[in-house]
Structure formats: structure tokens, C-alpha cells
């Protein structure tokens, strides 16, 4: 049997081909390190697979920042994240990388970002109105269209990576640690994204994927928001994840997809996939979520959650969907800038605009006077965890 049929993305296909090599060749990137003594940790916000995250203060200007201390991983991966953040800096709703510092003793790198006064999504999503959901989805699309136009796929779109300051209606797409440059014809690692947001292409081991992976993940977010079902596809493992998807989208279209790309399904699916009809989106509507659902919401969702990655809406096409007409009209009335996606860019100069500066820090117990990373023991300092932080 010959291998899988190749696939090329429909938009922004050759962005990196037309850029100088130094734009995408992150392995050759030379990192410019800042001064770790400029930062003082305040409290731990959470931890992820690859990092620990702290709220901190830049003591040179008393601004709040978020510091992400990277766990030991391949230097190549760290360089990739830094290069991507630098390439995207100033883009609409992209988290701004402010500084890169390193502890001289442990050599642990840390990234300093603009501070966003985030509300935990599990609390926030329960309070959002129909208009709020449209508004924030549109803001995510600005970030996605921008990064895709810059030849970059995020590969980890999920609620945890979307920071929302609801009071100021400010959104930032964060955690670019799994992001990668798109090169047509390149085969990528399918072990990316979080289970509930993994596209079918990842679950069937199709490696020639592209920006459209992010659009599937966005569709999963939209479904969870409008149907108030988090997560929408709740698989117990990666195999069960595809089964959960097939129970909604049906098995017929799944087999059409794997036939089209000549994909060989893992034999483990033989016993668990079964046969399922395609379900109508209306069946997920009930009294508790009907105020968030509209014909245009379901039409938009249907055009994102497609097995065939080539038939999903692109980010730019999505922004032109009727679901966003009211948002677009309101933003036009308010006179958004002409930036791609219609959002004011965040330059390093105005990075902290709109974020009130914090007063001179009072003594923080064991942290008073500590640099961001204690030389001998970068992760061992007793920083109080934030309430509700992911541990």
C-alpha cells in the first residue's frame, strides 16, 4: 500500500518560502538575554507540562509581568518558542514577550510577558452572553489569522491558552510552546495539542497537517461555549477521542476522509469505532443553553468541525461568517485600526498600556529582594500559589 496522499494548505501556503531563512530557522537563532535581577517574583500562578508560571514585578518600572520559567527541555524547543514569539510580537491579541532572562547558575531560561488580569475560564464561560461569545471568538480569530499569515500554526488552541480580562474585554492567545512554522509538504509530529482539542488528523496519525488544525480546536471551544458542555468531545484517551467525534460527526464522513488521504487506521479502532450516523447540531440544544445558540452559530460550528482539514473555514473566512456581523459592525463603528484583524498592535513600548502600574512592592516575606530566579535553586523558592491556580 502506498503512503498517505500529500496535502497543502489553501492559504498562506508559501509564507516561509518567501521569507529569509533566519525568519524560520529557529535552531540558528541567537537569543538576546536580559537581566534576571530586573524581576521579583510575587506569587505562583500555575504550572504546565513544560513550565512554571509566576506573577512578578519588573522592579525597574514597577510593572506587573508574568514570568514563565521553562523546565529542562531541548534547547531547540526553547529557541522555537522564543523565535515565534519574537516574530509575532505586536500582532493582534498575541501575548507580548517582554524579556528573556536566564539564571546564571542553573542556566534555566525564563520568559517575561505582559500581564493579563485573567478570569479562570471555568468561571467566566458560565457567565458569557451570546454576544460575548461572538466577540471573544472574533478576537481569537484575529490572533489566528495573524499567526497563520506569518507562517505559524499554534497547535495548542484551548481555553487554558486564551487569557481574557473580561472587565477590559481584552484577550490574548498565550503559550506558543507547541507552535511551529508551516512548510508545505513537511510532516509534523502528531503528538501536539491537548486531547479534547486534537483534530482528527492527529488522531489518525496524518502528519502533513497545517493551520487548519487550529480551526478544529477553535470549533471545539465554540461548541463547549454555546452548548455549555466542557469539554465538548470528552475522550478518555486518544483512541476514544476519535470515537467521541465519530458519534457526533458520523463514521461515514470519517471513512471518506481516510480514503481521500489514503490513511491507514490503527487496527485498535476496528473494535471501538462502530457505525454512527451524523447527528444534527440541534440535538445539543436545551433550555440551559438555547440563549447562546442561533442558526448562524450552528452553521459556523458546522464549517469548523469537519473531518477533512481542507474543507474547514480558514481564520480569515471565519471572520467573514454571518455569526460575526454584529461584532464587525460594532467594531467598525468604534473605528478599529487597520491592523490585520482590526486590532491595535501591542508594541513593546506600549506593552503595559491599560494595565495599572503596581505600587512599590511591600516586603514579600522570603521573596523580598529576590531576583526572579534564585541562583542556586530556581524553582525551590517558597512562592505562595494563587488561589485557584492549576497545580
Curated annotation (Swiss-Prot):
Gene3D superfamilies: Phosphorylase Kinase, domain 1, Transferase(Phosphotransferase) domain 1. One of its GO terms (molecular function) is protein serine/threonine kinase activity. GO terms for cellular component: cytosol; nucleus; protein kinase CK2 complex. SMART domains: S_TKc (SM00220). It is found in: Nucleus. Its EC number is 2.7.11.1. ATP binds at residues 45-53, 68. The keyword Metal-binding does not apply. Phosphorylated at Thr-344, Thr-360, Ser-362 and Ser-370 by CDK1 in prophase and metaphase and dephosphorylated during anaphase. Phosphorylation does not directly affect casein kinase 2 activity, but may contribute to its regulation by forming binding sites for interacting proteins and/or targeting it to different compartments. The modification Phosphoserine is found at residues 362, 370. Pfam families: Pkinase. Residues 39-324 form the Protein kinase domain. The active site is at residue 156. GO terms for biological process: apoptotic process; double-strand break repair; negative regulation of apoptotic signaling pathway; negative regulation of double-strand break repair via homologous recombination; positive regulation of aggrephagy; positive regulation of cell growth; positive regulation of cell population proliferation; positive regulation of protein catabolic process. Residues 36-41 are annotated as: Interaction with beta subunit. Can use both ATP and GTP as phosphoryl donors. Phosphorylation by casein kinase 2 has been estimated to represent up to one quarter of the eukaryotic phosphoproteome. Belongs to the protein kinase superfamily. Ser/Thr protein kinase family. CK2 subfamily. Catalytic subunit of a constitutively active serine/threonine-protein kinase complex that phosphorylates a large number of substrates containing acidic residues C-terminal to the phosphorylated serine or threonine. Regulates numerous cellular processes, such as cell cycle progression, apoptosis and transcription, as well as viral infection. May act as a regulatory node which integrates and coordinates numerous signals leading to an appropriate cellular response. This is Casein kinase II subunit alpha.
Amino acid at each position: 500500500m502506498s503512503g498517505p496522499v500529500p496535502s497543502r494548505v489553501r492559504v498562506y501556503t508559501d509564507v516561509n518560502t518567501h521569507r529569509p531563512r533566519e525568519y524560520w530557522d529557529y535552531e540558528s537563532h541567537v537569543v538576546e538575554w536580559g537581566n534576571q535581577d530586573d524581576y521579583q517574583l510575587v506569587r505562583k500562578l500555575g504550572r504546565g507540562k513544560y513550565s512554571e508560571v509566576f506573577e512578578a514585578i519588573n522592579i525597574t518600572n514597577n510593572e506587573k509581568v508574568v514570568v514563565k520559567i521553562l523546565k529542562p527541555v531541548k534547547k531547540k524547543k526553547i529557541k522555537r518558542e522564543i523565535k515565534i514569539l519574537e516574530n509575532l510580537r505586536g500582532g493582534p491579541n498575541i501575548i507580548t514577550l517582554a524579556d528573556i532572562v536566564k539564571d546564571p547558575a542553573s542556566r534555566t531560561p525564563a520568559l517575561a510577558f505582559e500581564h493579563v488580569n485573567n478570569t479562570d475560564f471555568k468561571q467566566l464561560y458560565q457567565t458569557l452572553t451570546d454576544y460575548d461569545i461572538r466577540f471573544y471568538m472574533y478576537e481569537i480569530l484575529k490572533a489566528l489569522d495573524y499567526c497563520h499569515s506569518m507562517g505559524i500554526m499554534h497547535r495548542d488552541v484551548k481555553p487554558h491558552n486564551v487569557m481574557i480580562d473580561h472587565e477590559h474585554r481584552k484577550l490574548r492567545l498565550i503559550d506558543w510552546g507547541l507552535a511551529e512554522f508551516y512548510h508545505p509538504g513537511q510532516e509534523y509530529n502528531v503528538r501536539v495539542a491537548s486531547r479534547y482539542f486534537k483534530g482528527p488528523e492527529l488522531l489518525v496519525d496524518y502528519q502533513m497537517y497545517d493551520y487548519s488544525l487550529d480551526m478544529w480546536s477553535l470549533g471545539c471551544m465554540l461548541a463547549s461555549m454555546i452548548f455549555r458542555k466542557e469539554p465538548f468531545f470528552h475522550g478518555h484517551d486518544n483512541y476514544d477521542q476519535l470515537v467521541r467525534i465519530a458519534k457526533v460527526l458520523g463514521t461515514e464522513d470519517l471513512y471518506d476522509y481516510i480514503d481521500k488521504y489514503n490513511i491507514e487506521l490503527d487496527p485498535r479502532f476496528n473494535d471501538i469505532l462502530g457505525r454512527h450516523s451524523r447527528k444534527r447540531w440541534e440535538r445539543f440544544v436545551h433550555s440551559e443553553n438555547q440563549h447562546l445558540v442561533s442558526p448562524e452559530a450552528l452553521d459556523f460550528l458546522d464549517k469548523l468541525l469537519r473531518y477533512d482539514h481542507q474543507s474547514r473555514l480558514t481564520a480569515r473566512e471565519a471572520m467573514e461568517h454571518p455569526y460575526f456581523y454584529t461584532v464587525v459592525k460594532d467594531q467598525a463603528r468604534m473605528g478599529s485600526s487597520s491592523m490585520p484583524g482590526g486590532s491595535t498592535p501591542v508594541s513593546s513600548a506600549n506593552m503595559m498600556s491599560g494595565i495599572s502600574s503596581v505600587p512599590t512592592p511591600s516586603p514579600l516575606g522570603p521573596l523580598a529582594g529576590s531576583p526572579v530566579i534564585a541562583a542556586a535553586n530556581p524553582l525551590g523558592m517558597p512562592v505562595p500559589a494563587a488561589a485557584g491556580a492549576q497545580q
